[in-house]
Amino acid sequence: MKLQKPKGTQDILPGDAAKWQYVESVARDTFSQYNYGEIRTPMFEHYEVISRSVGDTTDIVTKEMYDFYDKGDRHITLRPEGTAPVVRSYVENKLFAPEVQKPVKLYYIGSMFRYERPQAGRLREFHQIGVECFGAANPATDVETIAMAYHLFEKLGIKDVTLHLNSLGSPESRSAYRQALIDYLTPMRDQLSKDSQRRLDENPLRVLDSKEKEDKLAVEKAPSILDYLDEESQAHFEAVKAMLEALDIPYVIDTNMVRGLDYYNHTIFEFITSVEGSDLTICAGGRYDSLVGYFGGPETPGFGFGLGLERLLMVIEKQGITLPIETEMDVYLAVLGDGANSKALELVQAIRRQGFTAERDYLGRKIKAQFKSADTFKAKLVMTLGESEVEAGKAVIKNNRSRQEVEVSFEDMMTNFANISEQLLS
């Protein structure tokens, strides 16, 4: 019997959850500045939603998806990424309709699932923040979305982030490059890893994405996709680069970057940082102008990105960034005797309803243990409430640092705690 969490998952306990909540709140605030609204899609989708969009030959579909047949014999998969479900929702809910303001800007935050070998920053259930922008082919959309991710990293204080940029061009450009890559790699097929030998037949661009040493060696002198861009694709990419420079966002061109999903065209990008000497991708995305059409909607340009929360938080920790998380409690009530139990509950509830954080003792402990709890909670104020205080209708509240104290009536506590707090903490 297994009564532990499944391999590749984690429990996020309150101290850590506060960090998660902070990063999520900064992301929400940043996205709202760019007029993005939140979308929430199911954690599981029909298998075809993912296989059609991500690509039947990708590692995600062939190796990593959690898929099963439900009791109605429907082929279901836990979502391995966020874009396909959002595109499905965009089409199903007819967000392409003329009355819907364009571009449609959406963001999501949630769990994704992939059956991978668990390692630092990579779990089988992982959490992703992502954005999708529908309806604008303008290269300024590409740059605005990239700039939004860059803005988020700045707000979080993340340093040493490098933007890696490439273009996959139009479908025609990509097709021409695909053939050139096949011609280049076929003579050295036996030098490739087993996975890349398969990729050469199914999706040769994925060989460029391989992390295997023999594959990296094989593609060192591979032709560049930028040499196969048609005139329109070149113009789009040049505009993207010019606008990034206008916004003072530095970048490097990475012609071996192809992204692991089949739906991309034109601009693709990754933000990479160094963690303990190793490069780590913390955000990636690009343009996908055919995906809405794959789902039965009208041809609609799209651009988006996803970033892993686990990786982002790991980078924040490794870079020694202190997140401004409020951990102090406003007031702690030490309770002495059964006769004070009911009044303590009444007072602590009244204080909370005035907007303050408050806790009280429920365990009937000795006063010294209760004061220790107040220190653990970093309580700014401490009040001791016993039967004599209940009879008198008032109690002493003290500043837990300066030890300054004041005697206050219960009526004042229940109606005007802000003044009491200000008097003791100023």
Swiss-Prot record:
GO MF, one example: histidine-tRNA ligase activity
Give Gene Ontology CC terms. Answer: cytoplasm
What's its catalytic activity?
A: tRNA(His) + L-histidine + ATP = L-histidyl-tRNA(His) + AMP + diphosphate + H(+)
Q: Which InterPro entries match?
A: aa-tRNA-synth_II (IPR006195), aa-tRNA-synth_II/BPL/LPL (IPR045864), Anticodon-bd (IPR004154), Anticodon-bd_dom_sf (IPR036621), His-tRNA-ligase (IPR015807), HisRS-like_core (IPR041715), HisRS/HisZ (IPR004516), HisRS_anticodon (IPR033656)
Give one Pfam family, short name only: HGTP_anticodon
Chief subcellular site? Answer: cytoplasm
Q: Does the keyword Ligase apply?
A: yes
For this protein, the record's CDD domains field holds:
HisRS-like_core, HisRS_anticodon
What subcellular locations does the record give?
Cytoplasm
Q: What is its EC number?
A: 6.1.1.21
Q: Which biological process annotations from GO are given for this protein?
A: histidyl-tRNA aminoacylation
Disulfide bond sites: none
| Group of enzyme by EC | ligase
User: What keywords sit in the KW lines?
Assistant: Aminoacyl-tRNA synthetase, ATP-binding, Cytoplasm, Ligase, Nucleotide-binding, Protein biosynthesis
Q: Which domain of life is it from?
A: Bacteria
Q: Do you know which PROSITE patterns this protein is assigned to?
A: AA_TRNA_LIGASE_II
Check the record and name the HAMAP family matching this protein: His_tRNA_synth (MF_00127)
**What does the subunit comment say?**
Homodimer.
The similarity comment for this entry is:
Belongs to the class-II aminoacyl-tRNA synthetase family.
Name assigned to this protein: Histidine--tRNA ligase
Which organism is the protein's source?
Streptococcus pyogenes serotype M3 (strain ATCC BAA-595 / MGAS315)
